[in-house]
């Protein structure tokens, strides 16, 4: 049995989902990547106790990252959710949306992958909010 934290990645851009997964594996995490949020949600509903962190994009078809986060919370209220976004809008609006969806952390694009690993590690070891 692995003691490495498991991370689920959801991004509708296949190349990015694969890149995140590869980076996570090289950084010491187990990862599973999805490009369809509905498939990811179905998987998560059956495996919600296996993941320490869920990383997702905000802009996705069928179910955006905020809607996805709210659905995830129906299965697990303590999993850490990291939202990756290039979505630009009023800061107070974003903060309210993040709070409502119980987003644990946000990384805004563009970002450097070397900065993501420590943020995920911090989420994995931080106490439940």
Sequence positions of predicted segments:
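Receiver (REC) domain active-site loop signature in two-component systems and cognate sites
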Residues: 60
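Short amphipathic alpha-helix used as the core "switch/output" element in two-component signaling
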Residues: 42, 66-77
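Alpha4 helix (beta4-alpha4-beta5 surface) of REC/receiver domains from two-component response regulators
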Residues: 67, 88-105, 118
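C-terminal output helix
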Residues: 111-120, 124
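Charged docking surfaces used in two-component/phosphorelay signaling
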Residues: 18-26
